[in-house]
Amino acid sequence: MAEEVNSPNEAVNLQEETAIAPVGPVSTWLTTNGFEHQSLTADHLGVEMVQVEADLLLPLCTALYAYGFNYLQCQGAYDEGPGKSLVSFYHLVKLTEDTRNPEEVRLKVFLPRENPVVPSVYWIWKAADWQERECYDMFGIVYEGHPNLKRILMPEDWVGWPLRKDYISPDFYELQDAY
């Protein structure tokens, strides 16, 4: 049964939702080597994006490192919204002699809001150290196996995860009433 479309914008949104993400070279390599993953639509710059389950992140990252992705350019997290997933992402770059056009891929791990746990990639890319700590501090994502997972920006006794979209600062209303 076809879905009813009431406007041109709804038609475009429906096409985007049902479109199959094109498979990039990294996804092809992962499939060839038996790594379970899901291809996502490339970002606005054309960077290939791949969704990975949390329990498969470490073996997949180890394989990508061996494949030549020797640089963790950025690791971060974001909140999709109240009641939705938290996302831990990893932007990897294959640094070679061709510095003008390096191969890039972004891995995304979608995590539940309650007990978000993902393995640490610190032992593969040391650059993940403070980045994983910041994501823990701001979103409450636990990076299992991290050597020093503690708050890095907020005071040690801070309650809650300030960058979650459902976070309400306990002092917000008191500060607002003071003015």
Curated annotation (Swiss-Prot):
Modification after translation: In at one experiment the initiator methionine has been seen to be kept and removed.
SS bonds (residue pairs): none
GO cellular component terms given for this protein: plasma membrane-derived thylakoid membrane
Subcellular localization(s) per the UniProt record: Cellular thylakoid membrane
Quaternary structure annotation from Swiss-Prot or TrEMBL: NDH-1 can be composed of about 15 different subunits; different subcomplexes with different compositions have been identified which probably have different functions.
Pfam families in the cross-refs: Complex1_30kDa
HAMAP family, per the entry: NDH1_NuoC (MF_01357)
Keywords, in A-Z order: Membrane, NAD, NADP, Plastoquinone, Quinone, Thylakoid, Translocase, Transport
Protein name according to UniProt: NAD(P)H-quinone oxidoreductase subunit J
InterPro entries documented for this protein: NADH_DH_suC (IPR010218), NADH_quin_OxRdtase_su_C/D-like (IPR037232), NADH_UbQ_OxRdtase_30kDa_su (IPR001268), NADH_UbQ_OxRdtase_CS (IPR020396)
PROSITE patterns, per the entry: COMPLEX1_30K
Family: Belongs to the complex I 30 kDa subunit family.
Gene: ndhJ
Mode of membrane association: Peripheral membrane protein
Species name: Synechocystis sp. (strain ATCC 27184 / PCC 6803 / Kazusa)
Listed NCBIfam families: PRK12494.1
